[in-house]
From Swiss-Prot:
The modification N-acetylserine is found at S2. The keyword NAD does not apply. Catalyzes the S-adenosylmethionine monomethyl esterification of trans-aconitate and 3-isopropylmalate at high affinity and of other molecules like cis-aconitate, isocitrate, and citrate at lower velocities and affinities. The function of trans-aconitate methylation appears to be in reducing the toxicity of this spontaneous breakdown product of cis-aconitate. SUPFAM superfamilies: S-adenosyl-L-methionine-dependent methyltransferases. One of its GO terms (biological process) is methylation. It comes from the Eukaryota. The gene is TMT1. InterPro entries: Diverse_substrate_MTase (IPR051052), Methyltranfer_dom (IPR025714), SAM-dependent_MTases_sf (IPR029063). Keywords: Acetylation, Cytoplasm, Methyltransferase, S-adenosyl-L-methionine, Transferase. This is Trans-aconitate 3-methyltransferase. It is found in: Cytoplasm. Belongs to the methyltransferase superfamily. Tam family. One of its GO terms (cellular component) is cytoplasm. It catalyses: trans-aconitate + S-adenosyl-L-methionine = (E)-2-(methoxycarbonylmethyl)but-2-enedioate + S-adenosyl-L-homocysteine.
Length: 299
Protein backbone atom coordinates (compact mmCIF):
# COMPACT_ATOMS: atom_id res chain seq x y z
CA UNK A 1 0.00 0.00 0.00
CA UNK A 2 1.90 2.99 -1.37
CA UNK A 3 0.89 5.62 1.22
CA UNK A 4 2.32 3.67 4.16
CA UNK A 5 5.60 3.28 2.26
CA UNK A 6 5.98 7.03 1.71
CA UNK A 7 9.03 8.50 3.44
CA UNK A 8 6.92 11.33 4.89
CA UNK A 9 4.24 9.05 6.35
CA UNK A 10 4.12 9.46 10.14
CA UNK A 11 4.59 5.86 11.24
CA UNK A 12 5.29 6.90 14.85
CA UNK A 13 1.83 8.51 15.13
CA UNK A 14 0.36 5.43 13.44
CA UNK A 15 1.92 3.23 16.09
CA UNK A 16 0.82 5.36 19.04
CA UNK A 17 -2.72 6.17 17.84
CA UNK A 18 -3.97 2.85 16.48
CA UNK A 19 -5.91 0.50 18.78
CA UNK A 20 -4.37 -2.68 20.15
CA UNK A 21 -6.09 -6.04 20.51
CA UNK A 22 -7.64 -7.56 23.65
CA UNK A 23 -5.96 -10.28 25.68
CA UNK A 24 -9.00 -12.55 25.47
CA UNK A 25 -8.71 -12.56 21.67
CA UNK A 26 -5.11 -13.76 21.88
CA UNK A 27 -6.22 -16.38 24.40
CA UNK A 28 -8.73 -17.64 21.83
CA UNK A 29 -5.97 -17.88 19.19
CA UNK A 30 -3.80 -19.77 21.69
CA UNK A 31 -6.62 -22.25 22.29
CA UNK A 32 -7.23 -22.62 18.55
CA UNK A 33 -3.59 -23.29 17.63
CA UNK A 34 -2.37 -26.91 17.64
CA UNK A 35 1.15 -28.24 17.86
CA UNK A 36 4.58 -26.67 17.83
CA UNK A 37 5.43 -23.02 18.38
CA UNK A 38 8.78 -22.63 16.68
CA UNK A 39 8.02 -19.85 14.17
CA UNK A 40 5.30 -17.22 13.80
CA UNK A 41 5.32 -14.80 10.85
CA UNK A 42 3.17 -11.66 11.01
CA UNK A 43 2.81 -10.32 7.47
CA UNK A 44 1.86 -6.71 6.74
CA UNK A 45 3.02 -5.94 10.26
CA UNK A 46 3.23 -2.15 9.91
CA UNK A 47 5.00 -0.67 12.96
CA UNK A 48 4.76 -4.01 14.76
CA UNK A 49 1.59 -3.30 16.74
CA UNK A 50 0.29 -6.88 16.70
CA UNK A 51 3.72 -8.48 16.24
CA UNK A 52 5.02 -7.11 19.51
CA UNK A 53 1.73 -7.75 21.29
CA UNK A 54 1.82 -11.40 20.25
CA UNK A 55 5.32 -11.72 21.69
CA UNK A 56 3.79 -10.90 25.08
CA UNK A 57 0.22 -12.18 24.83
CA UNK A 58 0.55 -15.57 23.09
CA UNK A 59 2.15 -18.62 24.61
CA UNK A 60 5.81 -18.34 23.61
CA UNK A 61 7.10 -18.96 20.10
CA UNK A 62 10.82 -19.57 19.64
CA UNK A 63 10.91 -16.97 16.88
CA UNK A 64 8.53 -14.24 15.67
CA UNK A 65 9.12 -12.37 12.41
CA UNK A 66 7.17 -9.31 11.31
CA UNK A 67 7.28 -8.45 7.61
CA UNK A 68 6.06 -5.39 5.73
CA UNK A 69 6.73 -3.75 2.36
CA UNK A 70 7.19 -0.35 3.99
CA UNK A 71 10.73 0.41 5.13
CA UNK A 72 9.26 3.36 7.07
CA UNK A 73 7.01 1.04 9.07
CA UNK A 74 9.76 -1.52 9.67
CA UNK A 75 12.10 1.20 10.94
CA UNK A 76 9.48 2.28 13.50
CA UNK A 77 8.89 -1.34 14.55
CA UNK A 78 12.61 -1.85 15.12
CA UNK A 79 12.86 1.34 17.21
CA UNK A 80 9.98 0.17 19.43
CA UNK A 81 11.56 -3.27 19.76
CA UNK A 82 14.91 -1.76 20.73
CA UNK A 83 13.17 0.06 23.58
CA UNK A 84 12.51 -3.30 25.29
CA UNK A 85 15.22 -5.65 23.98
CA UNK A 86 14.72 -8.32 26.65
CA UNK A 87 10.95 -8.47 26.13
CA UNK A 88 11.29 -8.80 22.35
CA UNK A 89 14.51 -10.78 22.06
CA UNK A 90 12.80 -13.43 19.89
CA UNK A 91 11.31 -10.83 17.48
CA UNK A 92 12.82 -9.60 14.21
CA UNK A 93 11.52 -7.59 11.26
CA UNK A 94 11.95 -7.94 7.51
CA UNK A 95 11.02 -5.79 4.51
CA UNK A 96 8.90 -8.10 2.36
CA UNK A 97 5.50 -8.46 0.72
CA UNK A 98 2.72 -10.55 2.24
CA UNK A 99 3.22 -13.47 -0.14
CA UNK A 100 7.03 -13.50 -0.23
CA UNK A 101 8.76 -15.62 2.40
CA UNK A 102 12.24 -15.65 0.83
CA UNK A 103 13.60 -14.03 4.00
CA UNK A 104 13.31 -17.51 5.57
CA UNK A 105 16.21 -18.64 3.38
CA UNK A 106 16.46 -21.11 0.50
CA UNK A 107 16.31 -24.11 2.83
CA UNK A 108 13.02 -23.00 4.39
CA UNK A 109 10.93 -20.99 1.92
CA UNK A 110 7.93 -22.98 0.64
CA UNK A 111 9.03 -25.91 2.82
CA UNK A 112 6.20 -25.83 5.39
CA UNK A 113 8.41 -24.44 8.15
CA UNK A 114 6.01 -21.91 9.74
CA UNK A 115 3.71 -22.77 12.64
CA UNK A 116 1.49 -19.67 12.46
CA UNK A 117 0.96 -16.88 9.91
CA UNK A 118 -0.97 -13.78 10.93
CA UNK A 119 -2.23 -10.85 8.85
CA UNK A 120 -3.58 -8.03 11.01
CA UNK A 121 -5.38 -4.95 9.62
CA UNK A 122 -3.68 -5.45 6.26
CA UNK A 123 -5.27 -8.26 4.22
CA UNK A 124 -7.58 -5.83 2.39
CA UNK A 125 -4.51 -4.60 0.48
CA UNK A 126 -3.43 -8.12 -0.60
CA UNK A 127 -4.11 -10.30 -3.58
CA UNK A 128 -5.97 -12.59 -1.19
CA UNK A 129 -5.77 -15.75 -3.32
CA UNK A 130 -2.05 -15.33 -3.89
CA UNK A 131 -1.51 -14.69 -0.18
CA UNK A 132 -3.41 -17.74 1.05
CA UNK A 133 -1.66 -20.03 -1.45
CA UNK A 134 1.70 -18.70 -0.32
CA UNK A 135 0.64 -19.19 3.30
CA UNK A 136 -0.37 -22.76 2.44
CA UNK A 137 3.06 -23.39 0.87
CA UNK A 138 4.86 -22.19 3.99
CA UNK A 139 2.69 -23.42 6.87
CA UNK A 140 3.29 -26.86 8.31
CA UNK A 141 0.40 -29.32 8.41
CA UNK A 142 -2.25 -28.02 10.84
CA UNK A 143 -0.36 -24.73 11.16
CA UNK A 144 -2.57 -21.72 11.85
CA UNK A 145 -3.51 -18.86 9.57
CA UNK A 146 -5.13 -15.96 11.46
CA UNK A 147 -6.46 -12.85 9.73
CA UNK A 148 -8.21 -10.03 11.52
CA UNK A 149 -8.96 -6.33 11.25
CA UNK A 150 -11.19 -3.40 12.12
CA UNK A 151 -12.80 -0.31 10.58
CA UNK A 152 -15.53 2.32 10.92
CA UNK A 153 -15.64 3.08 14.65
CA UNK A 154 -18.50 4.63 16.58
CA UNK A 155 -18.86 6.36 19.93
CA UNK A 156 -21.52 4.14 21.56
CA UNK A 157 -22.62 6.74 24.11
CA UNK A 158 -22.95 9.50 21.51
CA UNK A 159 -25.23 8.37 18.67
CA UNK A 160 -25.45 11.99 17.55
CA UNK A 161 -21.86 11.56 16.32
CA UNK A 162 -22.75 8.62 14.05
CA UNK A 163 -23.16 10.74 10.93
CA UNK A 164 -19.78 12.39 11.61
CA UNK A 165 -18.23 8.94 11.60
CA UNK A 166 -19.50 8.55 8.04
CA UNK A 167 -18.92 12.11 6.83
CA UNK A 168 -15.28 12.36 7.92
CA UNK A 169 -13.98 9.15 6.29
CA UNK A 170 -16.38 8.83 3.36
CA UNK A 171 -17.99 12.19 2.61
CA UNK A 172 -17.13 14.03 -0.60
CA UNK A 173 -16.10 17.04 1.48
CA UNK A 174 -14.13 14.76 3.77
CA UNK A 175 -11.70 11.98 2.93
CA UNK A 176 -14.00 9.91 0.71
CA UNK A 177 -12.23 10.54 -2.62
CA UNK A 178 -8.79 9.85 -1.15
CA UNK A 179 -8.99 6.18 -0.18
CA UNK A 180 -7.01 3.73 -2.27
CA UNK A 181 -9.44 1.28 -3.83
CA UNK A 182 -10.50 -1.46 -3.87
CA UNK A 183 -8.65 -1.97 -0.57
CA UNK A 184 -10.74 0.37 1.55
CA UNK A 185 -14.04 -1.01 0.25
CA UNK A 186 -12.84 -4.52 1.06
CA UNK A 187 -12.03 -3.51 4.61
CA UNK A 188 -15.29 -1.62 5.03
CA UNK A 189 -17.03 -4.84 3.99
CA UNK A 190 -14.95 -6.74 6.56
CA UNK A 191 -13.40 -8.94 3.82
CA UNK A 192 -16.69 -10.81 3.48
CA UNK A 193 -15.89 -11.55 -0.18
CA UNK A 194 -12.47 -13.05 0.64
CA UNK A 195 -12.71 -16.66 1.77
CA UNK A 196 -10.20 -19.14 3.08
CA UNK A 197 -10.12 -22.03 0.61
CA UNK A 198 -11.40 -25.25 2.26
CA UNK A 199 -9.10 -27.23 -0.03
CA UNK A 200 -6.15 -25.48 1.64
CA UNK A 201 -7.44 -25.00 5.19
CA UNK A 202 -9.75 -26.85 7.57
CA UNK A 203 -11.47 -25.96 10.86
CA UNK A 204 -12.21 -22.56 9.34
CA UNK A 205 -13.76 -20.07 11.75
CA UNK A 206 -15.10 -16.66 10.74
CA UNK A 207 -16.61 -13.89 12.86
CA UNK A 208 -17.99 -10.42 12.07
CA UNK A 209 -18.84 -7.86 14.72
CA UNK A 210 -20.87 -4.69 14.24
CA UNK A 211 -19.88 -1.94 16.67
CA UNK A 212 -23.49 -0.81 17.03
CA UNK A 213 -24.26 -4.12 18.77
CA UNK A 214 -22.67 -2.76 21.96
CA UNK A 215 -25.73 -0.51 22.22
CA UNK A 216 -28.00 -3.55 22.38
CA UNK A 217 -27.21 -6.16 25.04
CA UNK A 218 -29.49 -8.69 23.34
CA UNK A 219 -27.60 -8.46 20.03
CA UNK A 220 -24.28 -8.45 21.85
CA UNK A 221 -25.09 -11.79 23.49
CA UNK A 222 -26.52 -13.33 20.31
CA UNK A 223 -23.10 -13.78 18.70
CA UNK A 224 -22.56 -17.51 18.24
CA UNK A 225 -18.78 -17.04 18.11
CA UNK A 226 -16.89 -14.89 20.57
CA UNK A 227 -16.39 -11.62 18.67
CA UNK A 228 -13.23 -9.58 18.42
CA UNK A 229 -14.31 -6.63 20.55
CA UNK A 230 -11.97 -3.65 20.14
CA UNK A 231 -12.87 -0.76 22.40
CA UNK A 232 -10.77 2.09 23.70
CA UNK A 233 -11.13 5.17 25.90
CA UNK A 234 -9.90 8.20 23.95
CA UNK A 235 -10.13 11.96 24.08
CA UNK A 236 -11.44 13.83 21.06
CA UNK A 237 -7.88 15.05 20.52
CA UNK A 238 -6.57 11.48 20.54
CA UNK A 239 -9.27 10.39 18.12
CA UNK A 240 -8.29 13.23 15.79
CA UNK A 241 -4.72 11.91 15.91
CA UNK A 242 -6.09 8.48 14.97
CA UNK A 243 -7.85 10.06 11.96
CA UNK A 244 -4.49 11.50 10.95
CA UNK A 245 -3.08 7.95 10.69
CA UNK A 246 -5.51 7.08 7.91
CA UNK A 247 -3.95 6.69 4.47
CA UNK A 248 -6.74 8.85 3.03
CA UNK A 249 -5.84 11.68 5.40
CA UNK A 250 -2.24 11.54 4.20
CA UNK A 251 -3.44 11.73 0.59
CA UNK A 252 -5.83 14.59 1.46
CA UNK A 253 -2.95 16.57 2.96
CA UNK A 254 -0.86 15.97 -0.15
CA UNK A 255 -3.54 17.42 -2.47
CA UNK A 256 -2.69 21.09 -3.20
CA UNK A 257 -6.35 22.06 -3.48
CA UNK A 258 -6.76 21.37 0.26
CA UNK A 259 -3.92 23.68 1.27
CA UNK A 260 -6.17 26.44 2.63
CA UNK A 261 -9.00 24.22 3.87
CA UNK A 262 -9.72 23.47 7.50
CA UNK A 263 -8.02 20.27 8.61
CA UNK A 264 -10.51 17.39 8.48
CA UNK A 265 -9.49 16.08 11.91
CA UNK A 266 -9.79 19.56 13.42
CA UNK A 267 -13.23 19.94 11.87
CA UNK A 268 -14.29 16.68 13.52
CA UNK A 269 -13.30 18.04 16.94
CA UNK A 270 -15.04 21.36 16.36
CA UNK A 271 -18.25 19.73 15.16
CA UNK A 272 -18.26 17.23 18.04
CA UNK A 273 -17.92 20.03 20.59
CA UNK A 274 -20.65 22.01 18.88
CA UNK A 275 -23.02 19.07 19.27
CA UNK A 276 -21.98 18.23 22.84
CA UNK A 277 -20.62 21.45 24.39
CA UNK A 278 -20.27 19.82 27.80
CA UNK A 279 -17.34 17.82 26.36
CA UNK A 280 -13.81 19.12 26.02
CA UNK A 281 -10.93 18.04 23.80
CA UNK A 282 -9.58 16.10 26.79
CA UNK A 283 -12.78 14.32 27.86
CA UNK A 284 -12.37 10.54 27.70
CA UNK A 285 -15.09 8.76 25.73
CA UNK A 286 -15.40 5.18 24.49
CA UNK A 287 -14.85 4.23 20.87
CA UNK A 288 -15.70 0.78 19.43
CA UNK A 289 -14.81 -0.63 16.01
CA UNK A 290 -16.45 -3.00 13.53
CA UNK A 291 -14.22 -6.08 13.41
CA UNK A 292 -13.71 -9.44 11.74
CA UNK A 293 -11.45 -12.45 12.01
CA UNK A 294 -10.79 -15.55 9.90
CA UNK A 295 -8.95 -18.58 11.27
CA UNK A 296 -7.88 -21.75 9.52
CA UNK A 297 -5.50 -24.71 9.80
CA UNK A 298 -3.46 -25.98 6.88
CA UNK A 299 -4.74 -29.29 5.52
Amino acid sequence: MSTFSASDFNSERYSSSRPSYPSDFYKMIDEYHDGERKLLVDVGCGPGTATLQMAQELKPFEQIIGSDLSATMIKTAEVIKEGSPDTYKNVSFKISSSDDFKFLGADSVDKQKIDMITAVECAHWFDFEKFQRSAYANLRKDGTIAIWGYADPIFPDYPEFDDLMIEVPYGKQGLGPYWEQPGRSRLRNMLKDSHLDPELFHDIQVSYFCAEDVRDKVKLHQHTKKPLLIRKQVTLMEFADYVRTWSAYHQWKQDPKNKDKEDVADWFIKESLRRRPELSTNTKIEVVWNTFYKLGKRV
